[in-house]
Amino acid sequence: MKRAVVVFSGGQDSTTCLVQALQQYDEVHCVTFDYGQRHRAEIDVARELALKLGARAHKVLDVTLLNELAVSSLTRDSIPVPDYEPEADGIPNTFVPGRNILFLTLAAIYAYQVKAEAVITGVCETDFSGYPDCRDEFVKALNHAVSLGMAKDIRFETPLMWIDKAETWALADYYGKLDLVRNETLTCYNGIKGDGCGHCAACNLRSNGLHHYLADKPTVMAAMKQKTGLK
């Protein structure tokens, strides 16, 4: 039996990953992390979606220790989430240092326990928000370290790594879940479901990608299939 663990926030990217994983694996487990995030409404959204989509199990882990250590606008109400700035340089204040290091490591421990062969995460390098822990180089390095440390070949899969946000919408549509992802996920840094606040970087990436996809579905769908190998 093929099993996988999906790092699941209830946002566009991880929900699309879950939808695909349910088609590719016999048994899919979800793991969501409560780190005292500003947009913690995502936890309830993740619970609802994991149940609705048919995950075998859904575990919510308390990692509020991260909130104490990592200062970010996503972990401190006193630090405002900035509006999207297309020319912004450097790492944004929404970056939570160590978040994906912790999440992927804990997800791998969970995968070890449930005998899953893969940990799936929705990180993306193509149009990422400037986060160093979304890079392919980082994921591969951590995967190698975790496999060595556990003496077990647990594979980190990043199905969205080389597709852009428009193509991520196309992937959801490919599996017949475009409307679900559009209306029932929570991507917004300010914790607003669906189309979100419309001002933060997460909402901007999501909205621009959707508009691009809807404006030229055939071309974007073809590009997504070429990059992912889907027929």
From Swiss-Prot:
Its cofactor is Zn(2+). It catalyses: 7-carboxy-7-deazaguanine + NH4(+) + ATP = 7-cyano-7-deazaguanine + ADP + phosphate + H2O + H(+). GO terms for biological process: queuosine biosynthetic process. ATP binds at residues 8-18. It is an enzyme of class 6 (ligase). Binds 1 zinc ion per subunit. Zn(2+) binds at residues 188, 197, 200, 203. GO terms for molecular function: ATP binding; ligase activity, forming carbon-nitrogen bonds; zinc ion binding. HAMAP family: QueC. This is 7-cyano-7-deazaguanine synthase. The gene is queC.
